[in-house]
């Protein structure tokens, strides 16, 4: 009888230990697409130096989302037709969970309005707390209206 109680106690301790071990983040495929409007920011000389963004779309792990952001356009020292967007964008899922991102390796062709780069996921709220990963982004910008479309493909860890 005493041996049976000891075995039950060991099983209980083992089960409790398993329950407190943190679950590691899982890498998952991520894809989204959407559209938005850029409200361009100009310097005193009238040059576009940045933009305030509003956006919406649909993405894996986000569902329908909205978002806002602010970017700066950094000129390329070697090519006046190229700009390097830098900044932050926060995606907000329909349930309110927030997924902040930072632009990395941004490159925009000012002749075509096509931009590429990476969105690096930052720790957010809700299910995106402690998130990591990144997704390649392609943006097609209309410089006259400020409208743009975008597509992201990559991996997210949470």
Language-model features: locations:
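Bacterial N-terminal signal peptides
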Residues: 9-19
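Positively charged n-region of N-terminal signal peptides that target proteins for export
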Residues: 1-9
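Short, low-complexity disordered leader/linker segments with a strong preference
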Residues: 6, 22-25
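Beta-strand-enriched cores of mature, soluble protein domains
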Residues: 24-158
């Amino acid at each position: 009888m005493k041996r049976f109680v000891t075995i039950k106690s060991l099983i209980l301790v083992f089960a409790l230990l398993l329950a407190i071990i943190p679950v590691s983040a899982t890498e998952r495929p991520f894809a989204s697409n959407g559209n938005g409007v850029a409200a361009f920011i100009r310097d005193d000389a009238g040059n576009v130096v940045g933009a305030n963004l509003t956006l919406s779309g649909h993405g894996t792990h986000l569902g329908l989302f909205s978002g806002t952001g602010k970017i700066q356009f950094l000129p390329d020292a070697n090519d006046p037709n190229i700009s390097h967007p830098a900044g932050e964008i926060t995606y907000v899922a329909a349930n309110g969970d927030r997924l902040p991102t930072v632009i990395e390796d941004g490159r925009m062709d000012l002749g075509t309005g096509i931009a590429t780069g990476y969105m690096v996921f930052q720790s957010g709220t809700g299910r995106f707390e402690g998130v990591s990963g990144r997704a390649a982004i392609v943006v097609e910008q209309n410089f006259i209206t400020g409208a743009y479309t975008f597509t992201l493909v990559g991996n997210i860890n949470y």
